[in-house]
C-alpha cells in the first residue's frame, strides 16, 4: 500500500520548514511558538521517512493521523504567510499557540500509532527512536504561554483577585510589547476588527475566543488606567478619571459618544475612522457617530492644571503661566509624560534602543536608495524609499511619484534570504539530541554561510556532531545521481532533499560538490517521484545565497519550466517556489524573464494550478515584475485575465493578485489588459472591502488607470469609486491615504476642466 498521506504530510512539513527559513519574524512570542512547532515536526519527520522507506509498517489509523496533522501544518503555513505587524499581536500569539497545541496533539497521536506498529518491525532501532519521540513529545511544554496567562487573568478578574490579576496582566503586557499608549490604542482597534471578521465567519468557536480576547484588552486598559501613572510635573500625576479610557492618555479634547462615555477626540476618532461602531468601553452599538464636546470634563481638567500651576506645551511640561485655561487643547502637543510605574519603566527602557531607529508609529526601518533608470523606465534615476518590515520577511517599496516609476507593492516577498532567517531552523540535530523544551536558537552571525562555504571544500574531512555531511558521502550521493538505476537516483535525490531542509552547511557543501547539475538532469525524469525529489532538493539548495546564482548559471531555467509543464502538482508547486527563491537576485530576474517559456509556465500555473501552486506562481511573478522589462512579458502571457479572476474574495488570493496588478499597471499594456478583463469593478470592491494591504494596492492600480486615460477615469467613476476612496483617504494606511487623496484630487481637476470647457 502506497503511503500517500504520509508523503503528503512530509511534503507539507518540508514546505513549512522552508517557509520558516525564509521568514524574519522579530516578534518574540510568535517566533518562539514557531520555533517550538519546528522542533516537534523535526522530531516526527525521521519516523515518517522510515514509514515511506517501509522500515515501519503503516495502517489506516496512521494515514488518518497524518491527514489531520497535514491539515494543521497547512494552517500553520497560512498563518505564517498572512501574519503581519499591522495585525493584532494578541490574536497572532493566541492563534500561534492554538496551532502549536494541535501540532503537539497530532504528533503525539501519530507517534503512539507508530510505536504500536513498530513492535512488529524487525528493526529494533526503529522502536527506540519512536519511543524517544513519544517521550519527548509528551514531555514538551511551552512555559508562560499567552493562553495560560489569559485564563488566569480573566478568571481572577471574575473572582476580583486584583493582586494576582495585576501580575498576570503585567506579564501579558510585557509579552505583547505594549510599550506606549499608542501601542495599546492600535491593539484595541485591531482586536475589534478581528471581532468583526469572526462575526462574518459565523464560527461560534472563533466568536467565543474573540470575545475573550476583547475582554482581556478591556482588562489591560482598565489596569493601565489604575496602575500606570503619568506625571505632568515632578510629583504630580494625572488622575485616572482625566485620562481617555481608550488610549489612557490625558484627554486634551474630551467628547461624549452615543453610549454616554467620554473619550479623547483624537483617540475615539481613530477608532471610528477604522469603521468600528461599538463603544470601546461598554461594547454598546453606537446609534450615531457624533462627537459631543464634554465641556464639563474639559473645564475640570483645565481647572486642575491651573490649580497645579501646570502648562502643557508641545513636547514639554513647565510652569503654568496664567494664560487662558480654555486654550489648553491648542497648546498641548504630544504628551511627553513621565511614566512612574516600575514595570512600565522597565519595558520602555528595554525597548528604547531597538525602537530609536524606527520611524515613529509605523514599525518600518527606513532606508533611502537610488534606483536606476533601468528599473524605473525613465531617463533619470530617482530616489525611492525602501521600507523593510520588521516581521514576516516582507519588503515594501514604493516611489513618491507614481508617474516616474512603477510601484513595487507589498506582498509576501522576501528580498533576500538572510543568514539570520536561514538560521531560524537551527543546525541539524539528531532526534536524540533535540529537546523541545528549548527555544529555537537563532544565529545573528551574518557571515555564517560564507564561512561555511570556505570550510567545506571538496576534500575528505571529519565532521562534528552537528549533522553536516562528510565530503566523501556527498561525492557518493552526487555519483548516485548519475547512476543508470532509477531507484538509486531517486534515493540519492530524496536524501539530498532531506539533508538540505534544515542545514545551512549542507546546502553550501552539497552545492559546491557538484550536485546541482545532476539534480537538474533529473528534472527531465519520467519518474514523477524522482522529479519531485529533485526539484524539492533544488528548492532547498536555492535558499543559500551562494547557490542562487550558481543554479541559474548552470542552466536551471529550462528544466524548471519542464517541471512546471509536466510534473505532478507538488513538483509544479516546488518548481514555482524555486523560481521565486531564485528571482530574489536581480540578475536572475532578468535571465528568468528573458525565458518567455518560464513566464508562460508560471502564468499557466497561476490560472490552472492548485491553490498552493497559484500562490507560488503569483509570488514568483511578483518578483519577476520588479524588473521593468518583465512587466510587458507577464501581460503578454495573459496573466492579467487570471489575476482579475483572483480578485474574487472567495478565492482567498486578493492580496497577492492586486499586488501583482499594481506592478503591471505601470505599463500601458497592463492597464489596457486590466480594463479589458473587467478589473475595474473588482478593484473598486477591493478598495471598499479588502484588507489594508489590498486597499492600498487597489488604489494604486486605479490611480495609474485614471492618470493615464480619461476614458478609464470615467469608467472608474461609473463604478462608484468615490465613497470608498473618501473612506480610505481618512482611515487607510499612510500610503493608501496618499493614493486615495491623489485620486480624489484628480477627479476634482477633471471635473473643473470639463466645467471650464463647457463655459467657454
From Swiss-Prot:
Keywords, comma-separated and alphabetical: Coiled coil, Repeat, Transferase, Ubl conjugation pathway
Spans annotated as Disordered: 424-448
UniProt EC number: 2.3.2.27
Each ARM repeat, start to end: 504-543, 545-584, 586-626, 628-666, 668-707
Reaction equations catalysed: S-ubiquitinyl-[E2 ubiquitin-conjugating enzyme]-L-cysteine + [acceptor protein]-L-lysine = [E2 ubiquitin-conjugating enzyme]-L-cysteine + N(6)-ubiquitinyl-[acceptor protein]-L-lysine
Residue ranges, compositional bias (Polar residues): 424-434
The protein's name in its UniProt record: U-box domain-containing protein 3
Protein's pathway: Protein modification; protein ubiquitination
InterPro entries: ARM-like, ARM-type_fold, Armadillo, RING-Ubox_PUB, Ubox_domain, Znf_RING/FYVE/PHD
GO molecular function annotations of the record: ubiquitin-protein transferase activity
GO biological process terms held by the UniProt record: protein ubiquitination
Annotated ranges, domain U-box: 237-311
Keyword set includes Cell cycle: no
Function comment: Functions as an E3 ubiquitin ligase.
Signal sequence region: none
Family annotation (SMART domains): ARM (SM00185), Ubox (SM00504)
Oxidoreductase as UniProt keyword: no
Enzyme class: transferase
Protein's organism: Arabidopsis thaliana
Coiled-coil spans in chain: 146-217
Lineage top rank: taxon: Eukaryota
